[in-house]
Structure formats: structure tokens, C-alpha cells
Amino acid sequence: MKDGYKIIGFISSGTYGKVYKAVSSNSNDKRLFAIKKFKAESKQVSSNAQQTGVSQSAIREMMLCREIQHENIVSLVQVLLKDGTISMVFEYAEHDLLQIIHFHSRSRTRQIPPSILKSILWQIINGVAYLHENWIMHRDLKPANIMITATGKVKIGDLGLGRLIRDPILPFYSSDRVVVTIWYRAPELLLGAHDYTPAIDVWAIGCIYGEMLALSPLFKGDEIKMEDKKVVPFQSTQMLRIMELLGTPTEERWPGLKNYPEYYQLSSFEVRYWNNLLPQWYQTVKNRDPQGLDLLMKMLQYDPKSRITAKQALEHVFFTSDKLWTTSPFLNQPIHYPERRISEDDSEVSSKRVLSTSLRSESKRFKGN
């Protein structure tokens, strides 16, 4: 059986390749799809760049997505191979969380309604808890990777940095020197942790929660670019943004702090921040729910061992004490969110290219990267 897809719009692009909006060439199938087309990896050989195949992140995403199925994880429909190019076909979502945040930052109300915020947050945690229960770390949670359907159903996407936790073939640090987008990167990663836990995902969720409240990134540091692929620079401005709000980490708050490779860098900061100002910040975003603050503080613990787990967060009183929110929060709401912007400014779109040829071979369960 051959399934074809007609590209009708360009969604976005990145280092991995491009994402398109598509429909099925089968007129009886009315669904919309998102097609992620990977560009081939290139390797410099003398003066020429040679195509060497699919990237490691693409292989990871394909393997992981074929093995998992959950209501809050974007569903893989099919893997396509055409002209040596691999594409992944996903279910389509009309929105992403970054777009929702930007919508509210420009609106008169300037706040995401509590019932919508609570539902989106719970669904993100629910999807991440499923990943963790299946020994998977996402490692790149951020608003742009949180897809949301027209009814408000969360679909976590982009598992290109996803990693199996159990029985890895290689240590985390040896295969991926840098994980998690800078504003959502946990302090143990900033301090050079070679081994880390799913707690890094929980920190990222805490940052996303704060961003939904304030409608701007909670810790917006300037990233220091890598000049040498073998040397990861200490992200001093990102660490500073965290300390300005949470205070300077200490051994009392974070046992084992001195064992991190970049611990010595903390002494280079001219100012020592003594207080955790998160409660005061919480008041400035006009939020008076003490249970929400408690959850946020438990997510943003310096010590990863003290950080709440995703499974524990699902049962936090912030969610269980309120039965008025649903997992379809956009229904019966006066707010109309515009759909993700789709462009036709791309050669694939202008040619209305049809993708086909299913990659039918089943993957085996695997261990490792």
C-alpha cells in the first residue's frame, strides 16, 4: 500500500530540516498532517562536503516515536523514504504553546485564563510522566515543542534529543555535550553534570510554567556560543538569571554542589544573592494561588534529588483541589486562538509536491542513544 501526501504549506525550519502542513492524496482521508523532512547530514572531506546519511537526532526521533503512544505525545503516522530523503508524518496540531503565549502577551487581558493554563500544564506533565515511566528523557522541552490541537489537547513533539535512560550504550555526556535549549536548561547541566536524571525535564516544565504566568521567559540569559566542539563554555549569564531569582546555590540547599565540574565558576560572580525571590515574583504576575506557587517552587529546586517528579506533580494539590478544568480547555471558551502561521514561501509548497513511499520495515526495540 502506498500512501501519498500533498504539501499545502510551510510551517518551520531548523537544523534538522523543514516541517510542512500536508493533506492525504486519498480524497476520503480528511485529516491534516505535519511532515518533518530531514536534510542529510554532511561531512567535510578535504574541500568537498559529502552527504553521509540521516542525523543521529533523526534516527532517535524515528525510533522513539515508533515505540511510544500516549494522548499527550504527538503521534507518528508514517515514515517516508523518497529520493534518499527521510520524512516523518505526524498528526497535525493547529497551535503551539509559544504561539499561545505570544497571543496573550499582545492581548488586553494579558493573562492565560487559569483553567487553560492549569490544563495545559497538567497535560505537559502527563506526557512527560509517561516518557519517564518508559525510561525516556525528552531533553528539549520548551513552548515551541508543545503542540496544541484546536480543542486544547497537548501533544509534546520533537524527540530529536530524546534519550533512553536505562542501560545506555554511551554515557550521556559523551554523545551529547549540550542538551536543552538554554532558557530551559537545568542548573546541574549548566554546572557541567556528566550524568543527570529526568529531573532536567521537570526543571524545564517549571520554566515553561513560569513563562505561561509571566508571558515571557523566566530565565532569559544570553547564550555563549561554542567556539570549540569539544569544549562546552560555562553559560554565565544564564546561571546569573537563575541566581537573581532563586538565590545563589549553596551546599545547604544543594548537597553535592561542590562536586560539579563548573562549581568553581560560581565564585566568579561579583554579587551573592542570598534570598529566593520566587514568592515575590509570583505576586507580580497577579497570581494569588499558593498551591500554584508551591508546585512551581518544587519544580525549580536547585537540587535535582529534591525536585518533584513528574508523577508526583500530577497528584499535586494544585490540580487535585480544582475539578473545574478539563483536558479540552479551548472548548466553550470565548477566546479564539489563531492557527499557526502557514507560509507558501518554499519550493516544496510551490511545486505542490506529493510525498509517497512508506518505509515499512518495523523497528526493533533498542537500547542506547
From Swiss-Prot:
Single biological process term from Gene Ontology: positive regulation of transcription by RNA polymerase II
Cellular component GO terms, alphabetical: euchromatin; mediator complex; nucleus
GO molecular function list: ATP binding; cyclin-dependent protein serine/threonine kinase activity; metal ion binding; protein serine kinase activity; RNA polymerase II CTD heptapeptide repeat S2 kinase activity; RNA polymerase II CTD heptapeptide repeat S5 kinase activity; transcription coactivator activity
Top enzyme class: transferase
Binding site for ATP: I11, S12, S13, G14, T15, Y16, G17, K18, V19, K36
Protein function: Catalytic component of the Cdk8 module/Srb8-11 module which is a regulatory module of the Mediator complex that regulates basal RNA polymerase II transcription. The Cdk8 module may sterically hinder the interaction between Mediator and RNA polymerase II leading to transcriptional repression of a subset of genes regulated by Mediator.
Listed name of the protein: Serine/threonine-protein kinase srb10
Organism: Schizosaccharomyces pombe (strain 972 / ATCC 24843)
